[in-house]
Amino acid sequence: LGCSEAEVGLDRRQGTARTFATLFARAQDWLRIGELIRCNGLQGDRQLVPADWIRRMEVPRNADGDYGYHIWLKAHRTRSVRGIPAAQHFMASEDFVDPDTVYLEGMHGQTVCISRRHELVALRIGRKPRHAHWDSSHLFNTLLREVSGEPAR
């Protein structure tokens, strides 16, 4: 992929890798990962990840049908995400314009959104939003509407 070095956080000093979270990588590298997912594991003419594995990542694995293998399958529209009420900071006001949007979500709201239909990968990095009304779907939907020619809301 041409990525820089990255770090995986541990659960404690000299402990076990927290593979469900805490992958520290540069913004450009997160975009490369998003592009790899968008292209079903293909980089140029090389299949780096089997396309079948990418497809299996995107099969719903929980009762709500919104989570696959470490990837979110739809915008958070309920007050409890993963059973954690505090996740309301990342609520969505609407579903994604592209219903096939998938995304990776980090600890402080860092998000890699992926739309194959619109050939778009977008990254949101920065500090955790400070207000409870942060809308996790607005930014990506604004981009999707722009590239698709759909009127803004």
Where are the language model's segments positioned?
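Structural helix-adjacent loops and short alpha-helical linkers that scaffold large soluble proteins
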Residues: 41-50
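Non-transmembrane alpha-helical segments in soluble domains
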Residues: 31-38, 54, 58, 72, ...
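Active-site-proximal alpha-helical segments within enzyme catalytic domains
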Residues: 21-42, 110-125
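Structured C-terminal helix/loop/strand segments within mature extracytoplasmic catalytic/sensor domains
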Residues: 101-153
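Sec/Tat-exported extracytoplasmic proteins
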Residues: 1-5, 27, 34-41, 61, ...
